[in-house]
Amino acid sequence: MGFKLLDFYKISPPVSGGETDPERSVRFKRIRWATFLSATTGYGIYYVCRLSMNVIRKPIVEDGVFTETQLGIIGSCLFFVYAVGKLTNGFLADRSNVKRFMSTGLLCSALINLCLGFTNSFFAFVLLWGLNGWFQSMGAASGVVSLTRWYSSKERGTFYGFWSASHNLGEALTFISIALLVSWIMG
């Protein structure tokens, strides 16, 4: 079981040459653009899962679910675990199938956000939000690794520049989607 899981995250073998074949060249360029758009959109969605707490912070305090101090502790857990995870997950992303690695982190982060909606226990929030920090740390490294694998050193600066705007996309998506959801629920 354990080895099958490792095989799931194993880097795909490189595809043989054929750079002179025009059909393969077109396909290669299409895949590179798909990779760039996937990494940018994916990392933007990571931010939706990271910033959701900021949108609901005020109602949580006003309803007496948590105090500002408790929310500060919860938020600190995410960033402490995120820092440790970014170090280790950066190393792992560099040695794994980055598509699967990034997808796993995003899926787990989304599931944790969903679970947070079913609890009002401070300790459960600390544990889940810290765990969210771990899965969040899988996002940036995966995006950087995928761009590094698909773009030459001369092209990377341009694509990294555009990719780095993905957090702005994620922040906009967060505030718009959460606001729409809350207004829909509140009527």
Give the ranges of each region predicted by the language model.
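Extracytoplasmic
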Residues: 34-68
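Residue-level signature of mid-helix packing/kink "hotspots" within the transmembrane helices
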Residues: 51, 79-87, 171-172
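Short hydrophobic/alpha-helical segments at membrane-entry points of transmembrane helices
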Residues: 121-129
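Glycine-rich segments within core transmembrane alpha-helices of 12-TM secondary carriers
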Residues: 161-178, 182
